[in-house]
Design a protein with these regions (language model features):
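Pepsin/retropepsin-fold aspartyl endopeptidases
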Residues: 1-168
Length: 168
């Protein structure tokens, strides 16, 4: 991961680790007021999202378009075909737009729990997301520090220029 410039505005997000049956850190996000969980995986070379998740009416995903099929090699070294899409989600008050590889098998991101009810994860935020936003993961404090998205950064105000607006 790249180092985050200390003068660059950042967002600090808490994540859960060691959740029952899930080894990767888990981050809670939102879209249209709907809670979404993503795994954070520094070893994933792509971002992944479940296809059945994209069809949830609560998310109002009618603007999401799936791109043409692409080929990729999985961990089993077998060539697979999948679609990609852009998906926007919210972290705090900021919106992040990311490109995802669509996973057609939703069972790949469901985890069993002791209650018997599976825990559903929308997808995986991998190296593309973590690198793009200069992510720094602190496993001791369970915090993720990421850069704010372009175009959504707080404007830098210069006191002299603000005062010039008020001169008579």
């Amino acid at each position: 991961m790249k180092e985050t410039n200390n003068s660059e505005p950042c967002l600090k997000i808490s994540f859960k680790k060691g959740l029952e049956g899930i080894e990767l850190p888990l981050m809670k996000t939102e879209k249209n007021g709907y809670t979404i969980f993503f795994l954070l995986d520094t070893g994933a070379n792509k971002n992944y999202i479940r296809q059945d998740f994209l069809n949830l009416p609560e998310l109002n995903n009618d603007t999401i378009t799936l791109d043409d099929m692409e080929e990729f090699y999985g961990i089993d070294n077998v060539c697979h075909q999948a679609q990609t899409c852009n998906f926007r989600f919210d972290l705090g008050e900021y919106g992040y737009m990311e490109r995802f590889q669509v996973i057609s098998d939703g069972a790949a991101l469901m985890f069993p729990t002791t209650s018997g009810k599976p825990f559903h994860v929308a997808g995986i935020l991998g190296t593309p997301f973590l690198t793009k936003y200069n992510a720094q993961m602190n496993f001791r404090t369970s915090e993720l520090l990421i850069s704010l998205p372009e175009g959504q950064r707080e404007p830098e105000y210069n006191l002299d220029s603000l005062m010039a607006d008020y001169q008579v």
